[in-house]
Amino acid sequence: MIDREVLLRVTQRCEELRIRLVLDECFIEFLPVPERYSMLRETERYHRLFILRAFTKIYAMPGLRLGYGLSSDDELLEKMQHMRQPWSVSVPAQEAGIAALDEDEYIR
């Protein structure tokens, strides 16, 4: 894992240089203290930061392909919305994702 302070410096530098930084946090929930490494709270502060997360890893449902991205860049999110397929998430994946959100005990 990359130290959070290093990530903050990299994120700041990317912001200064107008470079989009994409961080894959799909496995972060497997860490003992995920909050220590996550940059999720920094998306409001850093406009060019984009974070990837997935249900498929932590909830053990890899065949369903359910993930999401987080960013405070409304322009980017709007462009992504216009480019996506209307059926980008299958009904079984949607149902499994909704059910997974109620499984706090499984995550612990």
What do these predicted ranges mean?
Residues 48-108:
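PLP-dependent aminotransferase class I/II
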Residues 1-21, 25-58:
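Active-site pre-lysine segment of PLP-dependent enzymes
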